[in-house]
Amino acid sequence: MERLLLWVSVLASLPEAFAHRDLTGKVFVFPRESATDHVKLITKLEKPLQNFTLCFRAYSDLSRGYSLFSYNLQGKDNELLVFKHRIGEYSLYIGKTKVTFKVREVFPRPVHICTSWESSTGIAEFWINGEPLVKKGLRQGYSVGAYPRIVLGQEQDSYGGGFDKTQSFVGEIGDLYMWGSVLSPNEIRLVYQGLSFPHPTILDWQALNYEMNGYVVIKPRVWS
């Protein structure tokens, strides 16, 4: 009987730490700098990516650098990484190679980010609040590997670990979607506006599988 009660207690605690939920109107809040607090995003990605688009909203008052989206493979870090180095400067890493995008920003202010990459041309796009930045090119012909470990709140230096609190994210993240294709400019603007857009094939904020670790809280999004 005691063992049964223990399992009931464990199962009762799972919905918040490990869940499949519609998070519409919600955000993950990372309230402090740490080397532990993070969210794992769970996806069954079994084939390498030739193309992708990733979109999300973020709000932070950090002026130092921090990771926004970290996608690692077993034995390969920075396979796909979105990193903000400083105010107005973002980088996209593909297979440890990076390109940097610069934008004039009002700080602190919520931001909507979309970034895409296609293997055939190597062209990477970066959109801030529905507006495109100058296109860059990297890793033409490369394939982003399958079976990733995807983390929000920390930058991975190993597969699901190797965190450094000086690169941790402090703030709020929401409305995260990922496709295995390059969205058109019109589609990216629809995502930014929160209107009807193509169904996400990799990560879907409205049906998200995730695991929260450490001090991470889900709260309503009160900013736009």
UniProtKB/Swiss-Prot annotation:
GO terms for molecular function: calcium ion binding; carbohydrate binding; complement component C1q complex binding; identical protein binding; virion binding. Residues 24-224 form the Pentraxin (PTX) domain. Glycans are attached at residue 51. Disulfide bonds join 55-114. Ca(2+) 1 binds at residues 77-78, 155-157. The keyword Transmembrane does not apply. CDD domains: PTX. Keywords: Amyloid, Calcium, Disulfide bond, Glycoprotein, Lectin, Metal-binding, Secreted, Signal. Homopentamer. Pentraxin (or pentaxin) have a discoid arrangement of 5 non-covalently bound subunits. It is linked to SAP is a precursor of amyloid component P which is found in basement membrane and associated with amyloid deposits. This is Serum amyloid P-component. It comes from Sus scrofa (Pig).
